[in-house]
């Protein structure tokens, strides 16, 4: 039996009958168009709520082609060119996609551009270089031979990056490229608002304006071979203009350099420790963006329509987790559901009436092709999202893309029917209330609340070799029975640590925004965390936590005394490090499966092989059972009182340390898996001295999780796999109940 509501269906031209059929099958109460599509009159007449995608700053080439100096701009960094004499020529566009980017020759290059000696870091005097505009080459004189040089130059963005991606992915052939425009320019800003006002008048059947999105695209640049060159889902690189730079200088009292944007080629990645110029630009940009977003929302309301923001594409500057977002007047936020982390990124946004998730797969040919089974991805996506939804509900769900593609796959159609019904059933049973969280966990990094659920990310929901060992922290937490918040080092320095926090997690590689970089040289930060843990708090470090970029004070991890582990940075090799025996059985590792033969061999090896001499050593036979991801090399216990739980290959992967009334725990890495989510859950309960609370509402099988809803007197058990699972759930009174769950299954019981 299909229930109805809470579902948004995409449609397109000449597909009215099938749209009606699928709307009934999936219980859709709203219909939307997708990029490049329109809704038929017959679809508009179905009586469903109508979402209409609106692109404020593209799809009007008739305007922008007459004002090509008012497209968005970006500072680009050329390749490094080696000087072999006292002159060097630097080509501007050699590694950039000329259909997307075009050098800005209109604004004075000597005012807005920069030539830098990358060997010394010095800026080359503007008198020593000239621009050959015909060849897009900068000629530099008076340089030092065997030094590398670059040009940081302004470029117009002449093809909307999202439309470009869709164009290239779907092979749209000779379809006209949509040129974006920048509302920072008064004439273009007036055009945008005048156009929107007319669109509102011309769209009486639209109920929800689905802004996709607003004004500035996250950093997405392609190279000369039409490949992705630079991507940063949080990047503000594509937000620049000479006018904005001049206004920034007038407001903040200093002038931004091109280097403040290109950042030596890092383009201010969210992984970089944020600097003052970067933070100031974000504040400047978000102030401007939000002022104009509010005007669009107010216009939507005046026309009797809701204003919905898509969290993606041109979302830069909206900053949904920055204070004041609730003042913009937006009714809703919708975003792409890639996994549990991105689900929470949407669900936890404050200040809107409702949130909506656009589930995967997207109805595009790269997934919906003959021989593929998109239902596999659909269920996998649902399982990842479901565990997060139970912890922080989203109000609605839907899909995107071309419905005509999805309709050709009957198994997928049936899968979505099941998912939609289950989604609504969860809401009906819980009333949209989150499951109970048993601990309060804080993620500590440079960004804090402003980047809630956005840590350890480069591209949306796409972990890679350098990130997956840390991204798994968020993915594990997204569906765990804990309450999660994000705090910054500035928060701790200014206000201390909130009294209701049970555990703080700091993790990531050295010298990144997520571990903190030089902030750990501030003794007040170290004092505050130490005192808090000593008094009964819990600190969990992952990877290279609390690491200072340079070896100093005899420590690399500045809180090595708290977590019981430090990392050898080749400065103290002449000092022996001794490893205590690894503890084979512990509360933290109670659910870790270990092959009996491996355990026997490990025990016969005496738990460890102590190697005196430089660097010490440990355990030639690993106990195994845990995936720590990319190895963190040369970690060692700071003393022999540290409890080692895994220490393979001469370094520590998992350890605990008593610290006064509190505890520290070290984990070298945590890729997401059910086993690792269970491991982290046990770490959090142990570190916070809450072992006695762990059993209630726990599942014996890590592949299954329990969500308790005390207000409703209910609990559910979910199977997070595509295989049947058995588990035993322990209730609050210590009794147990057995469950036999089908693949992807969910079971409800009265609590």
UniProtKB/Swiss-Prot annotation:
GO biological process: carbohydrate metabolic process
Superkingdom of the source species: Bacteria
Enzyme class: transferase
The keyword Transcription regulation appears for this protein: no
Disulphide bridges, residue numbers: none
EC number: 2.4.1.211
GO molecular function annotations of the record: 1,3-beta-galactosyl-N-acetylhexosamine phosphorylase activity; 1,4-alpha-oligoglucan phosphorylase activity
Effect annotated for changing residue 166 to A: Strong decrease in activity
Record: active site: 313
Protein name in the entry: 1,3-beta-galactosyl-N-acetylhexosamine phosphorylase
Source organism of this protein record: Bifidobacterium longum subsp. longum (strain ATCC 15707 / DSM 20219 / JCM 1217 / NCTC 11818 / E194b)
Gene label: lnpA
């Amino acid at each position: 039996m299909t229930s109805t509501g809470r579902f948004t269906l995409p449609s397109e031209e000449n597909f009215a009958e099938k749209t009606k059929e699928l709307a009934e099958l999936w219980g859709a109460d709203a219909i939307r168009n997708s990029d490049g599509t329109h809704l038929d009159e017959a679809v508009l007449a179905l009586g469903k709520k109508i979402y209409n995608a609106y692109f404020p700053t593209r799809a009007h080439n008739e305007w922008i082609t007459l004002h090509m100096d008012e497209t968005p701009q970006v500072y680009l960094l050329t390749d490094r060119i080696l000087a072999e004499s006292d002159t060097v020529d630097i080509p501007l566009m050699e590694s950039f996609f000329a259909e997307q980017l075009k050098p800005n020759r209109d604004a004075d290059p000597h005012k807005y551009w920069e030539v830098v000696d990358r060997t010394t870091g010095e800026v080359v005097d503007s008198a020593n270089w000239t621009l050959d505009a015909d060849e897009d080459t900068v000629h530099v004189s008076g340089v030092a031979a065997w030094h590398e040089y670059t040009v940081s130059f302004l470029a117009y963005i002449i093809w909307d990056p999202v439309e470009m991606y869709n164009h290239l992915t779907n092979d749209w052939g000779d379809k006209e490229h949509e040129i974006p425009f920048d509302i920072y320019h008064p004439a273009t800003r007036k055009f945008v608002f005048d156009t929107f006002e007319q669109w509102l008048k011309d769209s009486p059947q639209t109920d929800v304006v689905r802004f996709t999105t607003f004004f500035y695209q996250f950093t997405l640049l392609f190279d000369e071979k039409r490949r992705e060159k630079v991507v940063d889902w949080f990047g503000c690189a594509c937000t620049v203009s000479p006018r904005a730079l001049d206004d920034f200088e007038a407001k903040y009292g200093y002038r931004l350099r091109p280097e403040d944007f290109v950042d030596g080629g890092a383009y201010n990645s969210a992984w970089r420790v944020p600097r003052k110029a970067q933070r100031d630009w974000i504040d400047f940009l978000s102030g401007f963006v939000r002022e104009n977003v509010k005007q669009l929302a107010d216009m939507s309301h005046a026309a009797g329509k809701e204003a919905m923001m898509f969290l993606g594409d041109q979302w830069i500057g909206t900053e949904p987790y920055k204070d004041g977002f609730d003042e913009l007047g937006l009714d809703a936020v919708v975003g792409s559901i890639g996994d549990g982390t991105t689900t929470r990124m949407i669900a936890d946004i404050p200040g809107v009436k409702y949130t909506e998730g656009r589930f995967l797969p997207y109805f595009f040919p790269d997934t919906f092709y003959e021989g593929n089974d998109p239902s596999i991805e659909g269920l996998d996506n649902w399982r990842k999202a479901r565990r997060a939804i139970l912890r922080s509900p989203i109000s609605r769900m839907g899909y995107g893309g071309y419905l005509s593609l999805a309709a050709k796959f009957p198994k997928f159609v049936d899968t979505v029917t099941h998912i939609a019904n289950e989604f609504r059933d969860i809401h009906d049973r819980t009333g949209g209330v989150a499951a109970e969280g048993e601990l309060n966990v804080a993620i500590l990094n440079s960004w804090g609340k402003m980047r809630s659920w956005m840590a350890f990310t480069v591209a949306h929901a796409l972990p890679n070799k350098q990130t997956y060992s840390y991204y798994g922290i968020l993915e594990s937490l997204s569906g765990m029975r804990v309450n999660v918040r994000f705090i910054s080092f500035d928060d701790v320095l200014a206000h201390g640590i909130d009294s209701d926090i049970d555990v703080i997690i700091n993790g990531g590689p050295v010298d990144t925004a997520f571990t903190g970089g030089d902030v750990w040289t501030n003794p007040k930060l170290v004092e505050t965390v130490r005192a808090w843990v000593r008094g009964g708090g819990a600190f969990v470090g992952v990877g290279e936590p609390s690491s200072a970029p340079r070896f100093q004070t005899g420590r690399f991890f500045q809180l090595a005394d708290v977590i019981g582990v430090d990392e050898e940075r080749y400065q103290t090799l002449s000092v022996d490090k001794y490893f205590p025996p690894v503890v084979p059985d512990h509360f933290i590792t109670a659910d870790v499966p270990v092959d009996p033969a491996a355990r026997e061999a490990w025990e016969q090896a005496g738990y460890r092989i102590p190697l005196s001499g430089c660097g010490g050593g440990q355990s030639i036979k690993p106990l195994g059972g845990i995936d720590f991801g990319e190895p963190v090399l040369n970690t060692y216990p700071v003393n022999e009182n540290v409890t080692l739980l895994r220490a393979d290959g001469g370094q520590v992967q998992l350890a605990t340390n008593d610290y006064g009334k509190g505890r520290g725990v070290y984990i070298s890495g945590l890729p997401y898996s059910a086993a690792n989510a269970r491991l982290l859950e046990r770490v959090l309960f142990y570190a916070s001295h809450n072992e006695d609370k762990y059993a209630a509402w726990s599942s014996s099988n890590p592949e299954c999780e329990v969500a308790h809803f005390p207000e409703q007197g209910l609990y559910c058990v979910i199977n997070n796999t595509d295989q049947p699972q058995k588990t035993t759930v322990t209730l609050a009174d210590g009794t147990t109940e057995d469950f036999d769950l089908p693949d992807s299954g969910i079971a409800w019981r009265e609590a």
